[in-house]
Amino acid sequence: MKKLSKRMAALSTKIEDRIYAPLEALSIIKENANAKFDETIEAHIRLGIDPKYTDQQLRTTVALPHGTGQSIKIAVITSGENVSKAKAAGADLFGEEDLVESINKGNMEFDLLIATPDMMPKVAKLGRVLGPRGLMPNPKAGTVTNDIANAIKEFKAGKLEFRADKAGIVHVRFGKASFTKEALFDNLKTLQESIDKNKPSGAKGKYWKTFYVTSTMGPSVQVDINAVQDYQPEG
């Protein structure tokens, strides 16, 4: 077992072995995020699904109300006049077969790849490169579309794609330590609603197993999922 650093061990002693109310958990995470940079706040959620079955896979997008606090690099593979549209909309990389070839040679200087449907036969050839990194465009994720400009705008504004990994765990970065706990909760609530809304048809038994939040350099805190689901804004 990996030995905890003195810093991590000290922070961990402040956390009780119990399930916390959402805002209390987020307060603790913010308090412990004391590195010399603005730490990213993450959610790690274990779901009662087995993604090896197609009807138990989860892959979708969510538009967080307060964004993620991170800037992302977007690449767009398209054709014709859409190339100039992608450039005008703020894409960091854009092109046709030239970009396909560049990516195939190892150019992975982007966080998200968007493609128009007409280019997908060529993009499909990049499966070996894109697949392991989770970067293959997908209609369900909103990354295969003819509305290039709007897709770029939404993802730059904080829309993000997430999926359950092979173990049925969802890993999502949903803010920064500099966010207020209320803003972090708004994002977390929106994420929870998206996961419930997109529950796989083949999911059986208990859907939500465990729900943890953490920061880049801090320990994790378990959150009461029922309290998140049952929250109703005042007024």
From Swiss-Prot:
Gene: rplA
HAMAP family: Ribosomal_uL1_B
Keyword terms of this UniProt record: Repressor, Ribonucleoprotein, Ribosomal protein, RNA-binding, rRNA-binding, Translation regulation, tRNA-binding
InterPro entries: Ribosom_uL1_bac-type, Ribosomal_uL1, Ribosomal_uL1-like, Ribosomal_uL1/biogenesis, Ribosomal_uL1_3-a/b-sand, Ribosomal_uL1_CS
Presence of keyword Repressor: yes
Role summary: Binds directly to 23S rRNA. The L1 stalk is quite mobile in the ribosome, and is involved in E site tRNA release. Protein L1 is also a translational repressor protein, it controls the translation of the L11 operon by binding to its mRNA.
Entry GO CC: large ribosomal subunit
Keyword Cell inner membrane: no
Gene3D superfamilies tied to this protein: 3.30.190.20, 3.40.50.790
Subunit field text: Part of the 50S ribosomal subunit.
Protein species of origin: Prochlorococcus marinus (strain MIT 9301)
The name this protein goes by in its record: Large ribosomal subunit protein uL1
Recorded GO MF terms: rRNA binding; structural constituent of ribosome; tRNA binding
GO BP annotations listed: regulation of translation; translation
Family in the record: Belongs to the universal ribosomal protein uL1 family.
